[in-house]
Amino acid sequence: MQGNKRRDTKPEMVVWKMLRELGFPGYRLDWKKAHGHPDIAYPGRKIAIYVMGCFWHRHEGCKYASTPKTHADYWEAKFARNVERDAEVRAAMEADGWQVVEIWECELKKDRIDETRERLRSEIEYAFIKM
């Protein structure tokens, strides 16, 4: 797994650019003071954005969430723990009053990026107004 980047991935960069284009600069990257180190955070507004890889985080119903055929037991356990940890992190963040936004890698593909941009704008605006 060493070859897999933990931060500054292409999907994250797409979301950074999207946020700037939408007029929401000023975010923090890989913010270490919050549960699970959100990929993108607005600490003052308590908004956490996680850019989730469909393969690693098991996006339900997504064609990119395939399971390797070799060492299936290993992969099943690894993926189950990833999903469990994601749920724990989300629950902890929400318990602390954070609004959690998850963006799946497949939602950044050309055919879905416009609807993803609109959903992101809507969720961020709501959080900005709510404060």
Residue ranges of model-derived segments:
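Nucleic-acid endo/exonuclease domains
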Residues: M1-E102, C106-M131
